[in-house]
Structure formats: structure tokens, C-alpha cells
């Protein structure tokens, strides 16, 4: 999304998760994508979205979500094969070359965050 926005002439930059709160005071708007938008106004998005939305709320920065209309759903089942409980490959967080450390920790790498409806200011869809 950042590349598309940048190509359209919109000033865009990507920030590592660890720096989101520190940079938020200089941000005018947070734009997120969504995996699914549920009936209560909340959404599921890639991990890090909740952190960005929470930091934005603390700095009174609006959060805008861009998603196709097909991602709006009245129901959401957390216990299906593909759900908000999906996990990414643990090696993307902690490489297996870390030998002794890998044997001593369990790495849980969730793929989605649930972003509460009170953290989102507007949804933009294709219709």
C-alpha cells in the first residue's frame, strides 16, 4: 500500500513497529488495510495494526482503513481453518541459527491483530 500511495504523490513512509509511538506526533493520518471488517466496526489486520492504532489514539491522530467492500462481514468465526488465530512462521521472529536460544523459548507469531472500533475514525471502500 505504501508504494501505491507514494506513486500517487502522497507523502508516505514506513516505520518499524518499535518506533511507531515515537514518530506518531509527526504523523497527520494513519492509513491501514484490513483483512476483515466485522459488524461491530472492528477489524482484523496484520500484526502491528493495533499498535499503530493505539499510538494514533494517544496522539489524537485519525486512523483510516482502506478495504474492498468484499471484506465487510456480518459474522466472524474465530475457530475456523483461516481465522484471526492464524500464526506466521516463528523463524521470521527468531531465526533457527540462534541455536541455544531456540531450544529455551516458544515463539508465537500471530498474523492478525483485532483493532477495536473505537480506534478507527473512517473506513474507505470501493463503493
Write out the residue ranges for each language-model feature.
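Conserved phosphate- and dinucleotide-binding cores of soluble alpha/beta proteins
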Residues: 1-127
Amino acid at each position: 500500500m505504501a508504494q501505491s500511495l507514494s506513486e500517487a504523490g502522497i507523502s508516505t513512509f514506513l516505520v518499524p513497529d518499535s518506533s511507531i509511538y515515537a514518530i506518531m506526533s509527526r504523523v497527520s493520518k494513519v492509513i491501514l488495510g484490513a483483512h476483515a471488517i466485522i459488524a461491530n466496526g472492528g477489524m482484523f489486520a496484520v500484526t502491528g495494526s493495533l499498535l499503530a492504532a493505539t499510538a494514533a489514539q494517544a496522539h489524537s491522530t485519525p486512523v483510516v482503513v482502506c478495504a474492498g467492500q468484499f471484506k465487510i462481514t456480518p459474522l466472524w468465526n474465530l475457530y475456523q481453518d483461516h481465522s484471526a488465530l492464524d500464526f506466521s512462521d516463528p523463524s521470521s521472529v527468531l531465526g533457527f541459527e540462534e541455536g541455544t536460544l531456540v531450544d529455551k523459548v516458544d515463539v508465537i507469531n500471530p498474523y492478525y491483530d483485532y483493532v477495536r472500533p473505537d480506534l478507527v475514525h473512517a473506513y474507505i471502500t470501493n463503493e
